[in-house]
Each structure stands twice: as C-alpha cells, then as structure tokens.
A protein has these predicted regions:
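Short acidic, gly/pro-rich beta-turn/loop elements at beta-sheet edges
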Residues: 17, 28, 90
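Non-catalytic surface loops within mature trypsin-like serine protease
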Residues: 11, 22, 82-86
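Short, charged, surface-exposed hinge/linker loops at domain edges
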Residues: 1-4, 45-101
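A short, exposed loop/beta-hairpin motif centered on an aromatic-Gly-Thr core
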Residues: 24-35, 99
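A short, charged, amphipathic alpha-helix used as a generic interaction element across diverse proteins
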Residues: 32-49
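N-terminal segment of the canonical double-stranded RNA-binding domain
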Residues: 1-14, 19
Length: 103
C-alpha cells in the first residue's frame, strides 16, 4: 500500500533530526539533507511495514496547513512517500551470495 506522510526536518548543529508528527516513535537523524531524505524514507517504510504486519492502527496523515502552523524557524516540512508492497517484494527477492568449494 502507498502512504504519504509529512516529515519535519529540524536543522541542528550536527545535521538534521527527522520526525513524523502523525506517527509516534518514527524518528531518525542525518548529517546532511541528502542523507536525511534517504533516512526518512527508510524509517517511514520500516515503521509502516511493521505496523501492517502487527495489525496496528496507522494514523491518517495530517494536512500541510495543519502541520505548518506549529513549525519553528529551523524546521521544514517534507512530504515522504512509502510503498509497503514494494518494500515487501524487495525484501523477498533479496539475492544472497554463497561461496561453495567443490571437490
């Protein structure tokens, strides 16, 4: 299933802290903006995948307007998309290298 959630990217001295206000406990951090985008997608996919597998309720995403009201000067909203069906397929089809010695 495809999901779209807003993440809050907060700039600090060491890089970025990323949180998803609609998903408690869905947090990550990164050194730069490129890594922040990658890490936010990764943590969102993992959070939603586990929630689906455990049949936990998944909160509906808040609107941009609603979330934008409470931002501070060092925070930015970024829309992140996650496709749990694709993640499951990617996990299932992961290749494994094995070394074998034949006599």
């Amino acid at each position: 299933m495809k999901y779209h959630y807003y993440a809050i990217f907060e700039k600090d001295e060491d890089g970025y802290s990323i949180s998803f206000p609609d998903l408690p406990g869905c947090l990550t951090c990164a050194k730069d903006i490129e890594e922040a985008l990658k890490m936010s997608k990764d943590v969102l996919e993992g959070y939603l995948l586990i929630s689906e597998e455990d049949n936990d309720p998944i909160e509906s995403p808040s609107s941009y307007k609603e979330l934008n009201k409470n931002l501070t000067d060092n925070q930015v909203l970024q829309l992140i998309t996650a496709d749990t069906d694709y993640v499951r397929m990617r996990k299932k089809n992961k290749s494994v290298n094995k070394m074998v010695t034949l006599p």
